[in-house]
Amino acid sequence: MYDGYISAIKKWLHNATIAIDPFHYMEYLTEAVQSIRRRVLSDESLYFQDKSWMNTHWRLLTTNPKNYPNKMMTLKSGMTISYYDRVYKFVQQDNELQYAFLKVQDIFYELNKLKQDKASNCFNFIIDSLASSTSKEFVECSKTWNHYKEYIINSFIKYKDRRLSNGPIEGINKRVKELKAVMSGYRNTKRFYKRIILVQNIEKGR
């Protein structure tokens, strides 16, 4: 989500479809939730039961419930509880934290079943709901999503039955970085660049 890249693509790749990968735009939403968590829990005037457990399991607040550990845990009290129930029990102690948790879970649910033809209306609704939130972190997220909305919606376009993704490009970048790590072994850069092209062509043939 960088305007410099978008400007370059528009200037040089006129027929390209610009799409922002879900990983990148969802990162803004999850960071907003975690920022709310940090702000709320830093208030020394508030007491939170099970705070120490949440401090080591904070990622669960912004994890899709379907990816939670599929097992039960036993508390010191002898009570058996699921991971989701323990997280939800914790966030219920603060209205803003509970709202943030439920909001991100609702968005996970909506996006998981969203199709391209409904993407525009769905994102308009989500952005409006974030913008009207009393949490400043969600308001900032809504501004960012609104700015890049066209490219976020494009991520739902399918090509060969797969959504547009920067996964293949990230894979190439990873290979280039690995080759750069051993670049000192080459006497000139021409051999290095030829090696990159060779590796990429071998991968294409598999």
Tell where the protein language model's regions lie, with residue ranges.
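Acidic/histidine-rich catalytic cores and adjacent linkers
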Residues: 3-15, 26-27, 46-206
